[in-house]
Amino acid sequence: QTGIVGEIAHVHSFGKGKLSLGYRISNTAISNDLVNLLGASHYDVNYLEQYLYTEYTGKWNKFGYRVGVGLTNIHNKSAETTQNDWAPTPKLVLSYDLAKNQSLRFSSSYKSQSPSSDMLSPNITLSVPNIVSTGNPYLKPMHLFRNNLKYSFSNDYFDLNTLVFASFFQNYLMQSYSFRNDLQK
């Protein structure tokens, strides 16, 4: 397994806020000789994720804000399939100081998340007798839309944070197990 991660970022301050610009890239290449319950095989895969973004952060009296927009590219390539997914990645954070020790914060974001290497691998794993998990090389990246509203209160004795949230998923990624009585350890 070999991997590389890189990021270039620039921040420019204005009178009332800051502008951030950047580009992040990560690439992982994996070459495996698999020996598992189904036999032996060779498996090569490459995971590439790129993220281009800009964000503006500022404060006006008791009101704070952060507005960001980005573009995420997930490119996964294996012997079975090649997937190329482009997704916008907007982000909005609004905050308001209610009093010296109280605040409200709203955040909203949309992002794309690649399946992990074990989720995409055709490898099969015996968890307990007759119960196995296996990857799926045809999985698509998950898209997550999340909204949060947070109330915070603090004093010398305790901190109270209350969070209300809603999350929506497309192509939800989860681990699954199945019963197989045809496999021997």
Predicted feature locations:
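Outer-membrane beta-barrel signature, preferentially recognizing the C-terminal barrel domain
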Residues: 112-161, 168, 185
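Transmembrane beta-barrel architecture of outer-membrane proteins
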Residues: 2-7, 47-53, 87-91, 134, ...
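An acidic- and aromatic-residue-enriched active-site/binding cleft used to recognize and process polar
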Residues: 70-72, 109-113
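Face-selective signature of the C-terminal outer-membrane beta-barrel domain
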Residues: 1-81, 97, 158-166
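Outer-membrane beta-barrel translocator domains and adjoining extracellular loop/strand segments
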Residues: 1, 31-40, 77-88, 117-125, ...
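Proline-centered turn/helix-capping motifs that create local helix->coil transitions or kinks
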Residues: 27-29, 114, 170
